[in-house]
Amino acid sequence: MSLYFPTPAECGRHVIFGTVPIRTYAGDGIQLSLVDIPAGGVVDWHSHPQEQMGMMVTGRAVFEIGDEVKELGPGDFYLIPGGVRHRVTSPAGPAQALDVFHPVRPEYR
């Protein structure tokens, strides 16, 4: 495995909230997560100590962060401070988002 150029097969693969597959790759202090939300998929309410930010790649998804709600589409960015409850749904069709976490989420290495 190349440290600098991992293949998709070499990245971490997990399923979150029962139906949402993610692929992950992490360095010492930062982590990427490619999230594929199926049509009707839900990343249910949760929080974590890591700071999270990301960008919608394809499709549309509704982000609920704290007490704010916004539908995002391709190219839209979001920021989720550590400790803030959040939820994401994709009611109209599949969606893909690219998340960045700092520090790394060890459970998804």
Residue ranges of model-derived segments:
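A short, N-terminal "cap"/entry segment at the start of jelly-roll beta-barrel domains
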Residues: 1-29
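Structural motif
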Residues: 31, 60-62, 69, 85, ...
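Conserved short histidine dyad/triad with adjacent acidic residue
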Residues: 33-47
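Glycine- and acidic-residue-biased ligand/ion/polar-headgroup-sensing regions
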Residues: 50-52, 56-61
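Short acidic-glycine-tyrosine-enriched beta hairpin
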Residues: 68-82
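Ligand-binding loop in jelly-roll beta-barrel domains
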Residues: 82-107
